[in-house]
Amino acid sequence: ADDRNPLEECFRETDYEEFLEIARNGLSDTDNPKEGWYANLGPMRLNEFSQENENAWYFIKDPGVLDYPVKPSEVGKHDDIFAYEKRFDEIVGGMDKEVTVTYQTSEKFEPPLPPK
């Protein structure tokens, strides 16, 4: 059986002394001048993001594709439907029940009779 400790094996790397020297003293100066190509060119300039692309996001098109938990009524629907339903509920806010409530309320109270 191999009784060697994996941690001890790390210290037996062929480059261990070189890495230890870099850790103690830092990297040496480069031979190349400080001009020319740099890997870090600052913040990247990304193209404008558009969710209207057919292949943009699977979650938006059908959240069930990625096995996200969805209600049976949500299967196969995309975000536009959910957003529409939410806005509709916010705008309507129970207005569909207003007629019934008004009718029930009017039955409870009798209107005052006009003066004779």
Swiss-Prot record:
Its EC number is 1.4.3.2. It is found in: Secreted. GO terms for molecular function: nucleotide binding; oxidoreductase activity; toxin activity. Optimum pH is 6-9. Expressed by the venom gland. Optimum temperature is 60 degrees Celsius. Its cofactor is FAD. GO terms for biological process: apoptotic process; defense response to bacterium; killing of cells of another organism. Substrate binds at residues 45, 78. One of its GO terms (cellular component) is extracellular region. Glycosylated. Homodimer; non-covalently linked. Catalyzes an oxidative deamination of predominantly hydrophobic and aromatic L-amino acids, thus producing hydrogen peroxide that may contribute to the diverse toxic effects of this enzyme. Shows very high enzymatic activity on L-Met and L-Leu, high activity on L-Ile, L-Phe and L-Tyr and moderate activity on L-His. Exhibits diverse biological activities, such as hemorrhage, hemolysis, edema, apoptosis of vascular endothelial cells or tumor cell lines, and antibacterial, as well as regulation of platelet aggregation. Belongs to the flavin monoamine oxidase family. FIG1 subfamily. This is L-amino-acid oxidase BjussuLAAO-II. It comes from Bothrops jararacussu.
